A protein has these predicted regions:
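Glycine-rich hexapeptide-repeat left-handed beta-helix
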Residues: 1-13, 41, 47, 53-55, ...
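N-terminal segments that cap or nucleate solenoid repeat domains
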Residues: 2-38
Length: 182
């Protein structure tokens, strides 16, 4: 089961069409739209400002999203966030892709259809224009006018979320203790 925590009177709001994997933690002012998938080990934590995740966005394993007072995190629709990425009090517009291990800091804005490369660090307040590629530490825009980010990632994670909705714990001595062996 995911861990869903009420913090300071705020309970995460999760659309019935969203998928939250076992081991993920959602705490406080977190809002997930339909089709969102939050994968294993993700932490979405919001004590003082809202975390909003738009329709059909996938937050891959071990993603962290957090906010500071007065600095919300707004993730758009059809966004792909790669494994181990950290999004802190930033805005990521629709159809963007955040690479594995990337870090996006407070007040940064990632434009629609932009790509932040794996391991890049987007500084506080930095703007990555729509449809561009940002790479490096600190991130620099290296390429403009990218073709639209392929929708395969989004469609693939929508299908995976549906598959995992129906997953069951393995049972039997060769798989370790399952629900039958607790």
């Amino acid at each position: 089961m995911p861990r869903i925590l009420t913090v300071d009177g705020h309970t995460p709001r999760i659309d019935a069409g969203a998928f939250v994997a076992e081991g993920a933690t959602l705490a406080g002012q977190v809002h997930l739209a339909a089709g969102v998938s939050v994968w294993f080990g993700c932490v979405l934590r919001s004590e003082r400002a809202t975390v909003t995740v738009g329709r059909d966005t996938n937050l891959q394993d071990l993603t962290i999203i957090h906010t500071d007072e007065g600095v919300p995190a707004a993730i758009g629709e059809r966004v792909t966030v790669g494994h181990r990425a950290i999004l802190h009090g930033c805005t990521v517009e629709d159809d963007a892709l955040i690479g594995m291990g990337a870090i996006v800091l407070n007040g940064a804005r990632i434009g629609a259809g932009a790509v932040v490369g794996a391991g890049a660090v987007v500084r506080e307040g930095q703007e990555v224009p729509p449809g561009t590629l940002a790479v490096g530490v600190p991130a620099k825009v290296r390429e403009a006018e990218l073709p639209p980010v392929p929708r395969r990632n989004v469609a693939g994670y929508l299908a995976l979320a549906e598959l995992y909705r129906h997953a069951e714990p393995a049972r039997g001595p060769e798989h370790g203790p399952g629900e039958d062996h607790a």
